[in-house]
């Protein structure tokens, strides 16, 4: 009887220990899976955010470059320099338009309005740069400077503000 009591007492003690052991193993497996999911989601978010910020940096740089090239066209004195500047502006505009198109995939619903504003500001800037180059080519430097320091400068500044606004949400 004493032997049977010892066995049943051992069993009574071991059953909760085994149950706790099984629960801890299951709990650890679930915790590891949850950590992997969180890590995967965080990596995806971080990668998207970093790529988004990189694209925005390229857009910002191209915008500033185009604005500077517009002013360079005004101060150019010979035809070859003007033609070279126009080619550079067209190249930069093409790259910027590609960057804007590539950036669309990162635009969230909350950023859509700001992105649309950015594109509209670029379109205004692009149109007025054409006017700057026309005035400059005709020798109307004052009108060209007025546009460069007015509408084009304002559009460029608005684009920079749009980019800052989008970066804040990332």
Describe each region flagged by the PLM:
Residues 77-90, 96:
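Extracytoplasmic/periplasmic/luminal assembly and interaction segments
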Residues 34, 58, 95, 158:
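Charged catalytic carboxylate motif
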Residues 1-54, 61-81, 133, 167-170:
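Hydrophobic membrane-targeting segments
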Residues 74-83, 104-164:
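Polar/charged, Q/E/K-enriched amphipathic alpha-helical segments with strong coiled-coil propensity
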Residues 31-34, 38, 92, 121, ...:
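Alpha-helical structural motif
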């Amino acid at each position: 009887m004493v032997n049977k009591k010892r066995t049943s007492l051992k069993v009574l003690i071991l059953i909760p220990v085994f149950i706790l052991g099984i629960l801890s193993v299951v709990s650890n497996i679930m915790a590891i899976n949850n950590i992997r999911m969180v890590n995967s989601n965080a990596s995806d978010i971080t990668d998207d955010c970093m790529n988004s910020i990189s694209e925005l940096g390229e857009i910002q740089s191209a915008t500033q470059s185009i604005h500077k090239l517009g002013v360079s066209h005004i101060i150019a004195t010979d035809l070859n320099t003007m033609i070279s500047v126009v080619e550079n502006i067209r190249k930069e505009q093409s790259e910027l338009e590609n960057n804007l198109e590539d950036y669309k995939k990162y635009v969230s619903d909350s950023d859509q309005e700001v992105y649309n504003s950015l594109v509209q500001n670029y379109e205004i800037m692009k149109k007025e740069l054409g006017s700057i180059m026309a005035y400059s080519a005709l020798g109307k430097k004052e009108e060209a400077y007025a546009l460069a320091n007015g509408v084009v400068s304002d559009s460029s500044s608005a684009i920079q503000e749009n980019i800052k606004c989008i970066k804040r949400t990332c």
